Swiss-Prot record:
Listed name of the protein: Calerythrin
Disulfide bonds listed in the record: none
Sorted UniProt keywords: Calcium, Metal-binding, Repeat
Lineage, broadest ranks: Bacteria, Bacillati, Actinomycetota, Actinomycetes, Pseudonocardiales
InterPro entries linked: EF-hand-dom_pair, EF_Hand_1_Ca_BS, EF_hand_dom
Binding site for Ca(2+) 2: 113, 115, 117, 119, 124
Domain of life according to the entry: Bacteria
The organism of origin for this protein: Saccharopolyspora erythraea
Other facts: This protein binds calcium.
Amino acid sequence: MTTAIASDRLKKRFDRWDFDGNGALERADFEKEAQHIAEAFGKDAGAAEVQTLKNAFGGLFDYLAKEAGVGSDGSLTEEQFIRVTENLIFEQGEASFNRVLGPVVKGTWGMCDKNADGQINADEFAAWLTALGMSKAEAAEAFNQVDTNGNGELSLDELLTAVRDFHFGRLDVELLG
């Protein structure tokens, strides 16, 4: 993937996560993203899986802030966010990506797995992606692309691979909104 494509995808993510539109990402923006996801799944703010997701997004913010040199009470500019994230993708590689983004994917996956069977079926996946603004038809097509073993269900590993592949330019299905 070219740096231009990565930068475009990361700019889109920055804009989505900048909830208050002030041109910077703060911890509150990451907390609001976790809340937004929880609400999309109809989860109560006090639910354990909501707290897990909030903690995961908090950890992601802490990582980004530390790498940008702004501290956990600071804020990241778009340039800092893109620089740190491109470094994660292009320099540090897949293992680091999994370590940093894995908890966020796992937290979202936990909310998506409504029947708690350890897998995400096509209906659960569609509920997630339609909450992000995709049509049901787009969600069905995305499921088919992400279900790499073709068993009609997604494991946590398949989902993390899909998120990573999007950021590495190997997949065009955006799963984190």
